[in-house]
Amino acid sequence: MGQRIPVTLGNIAPLSLRPFQPGRIALVCEGGGQRGIFTAGVLDEFMRAQFNPFDLYLGTSAGAQNLSAFICNQPGYARKVIMRYTTKREFFDPLRFVRGGNLIDLDWLVEATASQMPLQMDTAARLFDSGKSFYMCACRQDDYAPNYFLPTKQNWLDVIRASSAIPGFYRSGVSLEGINYLDGGISDAIPVKEAARQGAKTLVVIRTVPSQMYYTPQWFKRMERWLGDSSLQPLVNLVQHHETSYRDIQQFIEKPPGKLRIFEIYPPKPLHSIALGSRIPALREDYKLGRLCGRYFLATVGKLLTEKAPLTRHLVPVVTPESIVIPPAPVANDTLVAEVSDAPQANDPTFNNEDLA
């Protein structure tokens, strides 16, 4: 049997790890709607430390969106999308849903972010040229089979839409190559099995719920009783399929087969944010928690997965020479002009000052 190592605040299991040969490393990100703000925090901490030893990336729904920002090396991007765009009424509108429209407008979200905050796909292309692969999971609408798409400049945004098309809330689904797709979380919310199938020996899995959370059977029984004889019966069948798949994935993570090693990063308790309709303060708290969990992972596990240690947060103190030269004082009314970097997201003040703990 393989090995599962839980990584969260308050868990000391990572502290007892010994050096090992990781082999092919995969980064797998769970969906979860706005709960993906936790994943955004973890991945922003990875980017701050320039930590990217992964050979393979797999994500579903919000996990695919977060990984897109990580692969394009845009720190702060996913946090902005979740906190500034998914909280707008243009995206999430219960009144529109009651009137027969979509509860979530993925078309608006994708178009707005693409025009105002485009992904740096050229950066990702160079990563792919080096031999690394990224797969986004979407689920076929006809038989619920999971499909894994390699994004290109031409289809990247369409695949994100397909992977995030929550059934019932985005009624039409997304058509790719003549086939209708829905949210990949229906059949493969955490694509760990696909990562293992593609040869990964070490998996770093970022969850958006505490580990070992299962669905409550009583909840399903009530829903079946309420909706069993209605026109929503297909939706009940779909949710049951998702529940069975999710339970199977959870058991795979808890008891990895063979010599597979799984590092599971997860929040120590349920997040303040929810899948849709979260408040800004809740999102901010969960983002900070993700940053802290990412930092804990880097301090304990990160150095074992790469030959080059992750960058530390604190710099080595500068030795001051004995003779100190004091420059002339600036004119009192001079305006301080800060140097501006052209790097994507580099001038995001909220990101730079976020969570300095």
From Swiss-Prot:
Enzyme class: hydrolase
Domain PNPLA: 27-196
Active site per database record: S61 (nucleophile), D183 (proton acceptor)
Domain of life the protein comes from: Bacteria
Motif DGA/G per record, residues: 183-185
Bridged cysteine pairs (disulfide): none
Single Gene Ontology BP annotation: lipid catabolic process
Function description: Probable lipid hydrolase.
Name of the protein: Uncharacterized protein YjjU
